[in-house]
């Protein structure tokens, strides 16, 4: 059995590096003071401290939060705004990373700007680029990404549809931040900058542009008789003339209605919307439909009158045919003209529908 001092020394060696940093040890190298991440099992890149005091990489916490808003070790709930306002262990390290160690750095495209890769991913990209590789794989927030160094795009290995541009540029170009962490600490900016993807791309400005849609596009264009499209906002100069003509046609007698019945339905439909009030450019669809419905009622009343007149003429024609058939059977020759027309009109109004033949 080991001595008590040996057990203590063994347990200290098994502690994470961040706990070794609290101990005063002369043979500990400065590089070992960087905490280790329990998610990616590597040294932390931009370490953040959760409310439960557990330390992880910022991107590792971000990827794990998609599965559940809880700590990966103790399962304590993570606040909703933690990714917007993370608690960095060393904010100076973020500023130093943005300045870089060399002349060039690697960036990926975001909305309204470029994000700089974290130091570890930048080293992997630079190493693959210097060796002339066509592509390389990167582990970001628990997802495997493929960097296409020929087309300068990145995408998830299991989802090729979502692509993002990447580039190799000088270190001093304007940038939004590093690995999803903004360089500016303005509270208003941070609240609006909710990052939605693992590689730190934001999607706030997309909602403001997509919500604005023109109202005029929802108005249906009018179709004229010759098949051309006319816009309600640009009426023809003869609109007032066609308005007077349409009402004049509606007030004609039965003969005029009979002539109207030979016209096509397309002409009636064309007169209804054009005979309404001339709409302004900002006229809504409801106003256009109400004007069209008022004219359609006038046209429908004329159609009903024409329908009743047609039925009366059909009854007269059937009665005339019945009289001529019976006159042939009795052997009496009659002419259709003369009193036949008068007798037919009387017989057609009888309720029983029977006709009696009176010889003259």
Swiss-Prot record:
Residue ranges with Acidic residues bias: 284-294
Subcellular location: Cytoplasm, Cytosol; Nucleus
Cross-link (Glycyl lysine isopeptide (Lys-Gly) (interchain with G-Cter in ubiquitin)): 85, 95, 131, 176
Chain positions of all zinc fingers (RING-type): 37-75
CDD domains, per database record: RING-HC_RNF146
Cellular-component GO terms for this entry: cytosol; nucleoplasm; plasma membrane
Regions of compositional bias (Low complexity) in chain numbering: 295-305
Comp. bias intervals (Polar residues): 307-333
EC number: 2.3.2.27
Top-level taxon of origin: Eukaryota
Gene3D superfamilies: 3.30.720.50, Zinc/RING finger domain, C3HC4 (zinc finger) (3.30.40.10)
Region of interest (Disordered), residue spans: 259-360
EC top class, as a word: transferase
GO molecular function per UniProt: poly-ADP-D-ribose binding; ubiquitin protein ligase activity; ubiquitin-protein transferase activity; zinc ion binding
GO biological process terms held by the UniProt record: positive regulation of canonical Wnt signaling pathway; protein autoubiquitination; protein K48-linked ubiquitination; ubiquitin-dependent protein catabolic process; Wnt signaling pathway
Changes after translation: Ubiquitinated; autoubiquitinated. Autoubiquitination is enhanced upon poly(ADP-ribose)-binding.
Limits of the WWE domain: 92-168
Domain notes per entry: The WWE domain mediates non-covalent poly(ADP-ribose)-binding.
The protein's role, per its UniProt record: E3 ubiquitin-protein ligase that specifically binds poly-ADP-ribosylated (PARsylated) proteins and mediates their ubiquitination and subsequent degradation. May regulate many important biological processes, such as cell survival and DNA damage response. Acts as an activator of the Wnt signaling pathway by mediating the ubiquitination of PARsylated AXIN1 and AXIN2, 2 key components of the beta-catenin destruction complex. Acts in cooperation with tankyrase proteins (TNKS and TNKS2), which mediate PARsylation of target proteins AXIN1, AXIN2, BLZF1, CASC3, TNKS and TNKS2.
Protein name per the record: E3 ubiquitin-protein ligase RNF146
Organism listed in the record: Macaca fascicularis
């Amino acid at each position: 059995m080991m001595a008590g001092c040996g057990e203590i020394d063994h347990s200290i060696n098994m502690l994470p590096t961040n706990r070794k940093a609290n101990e005063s040890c002369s043979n500990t190298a400065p590089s070992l003071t960087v905490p280790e991440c329990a998610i990616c099992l590597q040294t932390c890149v931009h370490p953040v401290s959760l409310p439960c005091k557990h330390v992880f990489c910022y991107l590792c916490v971000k990827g794990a939060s998609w599965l559940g808003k809880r700590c990966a070790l103790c399962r304590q709930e993570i606040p909703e705004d933690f990714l917007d306002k993370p608690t960095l262990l060393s904010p100076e390290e973020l500023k130093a990373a943005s300045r870089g160690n060399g002349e060039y750095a690697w960036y990926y495209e975001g909305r309204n700007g470029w994000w700089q890769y974290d130091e570890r991913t930048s080293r992997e990209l630079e190493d693959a680029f210097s060796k002339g590789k066509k592509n390389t794989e990167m582990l970001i927030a628990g997802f495997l990404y493929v960097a296409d160094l020929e087309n300068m795009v990145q995408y998830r290995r299991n989802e090729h549809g979502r692509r993002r541009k990447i580039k190799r540029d000088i270190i001093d170009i304007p940038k939004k931040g590093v690995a999803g962490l903004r360089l500016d600490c303005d509270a208003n900016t941070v609240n609006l900058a909710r990052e939605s993807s693992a590689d730190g791309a934001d999607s706030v400005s997309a909602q403001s542009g997509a919500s604005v849609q023109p109202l005029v596009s929802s108005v249906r264009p009018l179709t004229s008789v010759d098949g051309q499209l006319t816009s309600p906002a640009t009426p023809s100069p003869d609109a007032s003339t066609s308005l007077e003509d349409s009402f004049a046609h509606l007030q004609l007698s039965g003969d005029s209605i009979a002539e109207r019945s030979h016209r096509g339905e397309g002409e009636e439909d064309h007169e209804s919307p054009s005979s309404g009030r001339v709409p302004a450019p900002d006229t809504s669809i409801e106003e256009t439909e109400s004007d069209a419905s008022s004219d359609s009622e006038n046209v429908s009343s004329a159609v009903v009158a024409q329908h009743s007149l047609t039925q009366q003429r059909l009854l007269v024609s059937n009665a005339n045919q019945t009289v001529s058939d019976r006159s042939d059977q009795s052997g009496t020759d009659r002419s259709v003209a003369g009193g036949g027309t008068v007798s037919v009109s009387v017989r057609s109004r009888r309720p029983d529908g029977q006709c009696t033949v009176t010889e003259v």
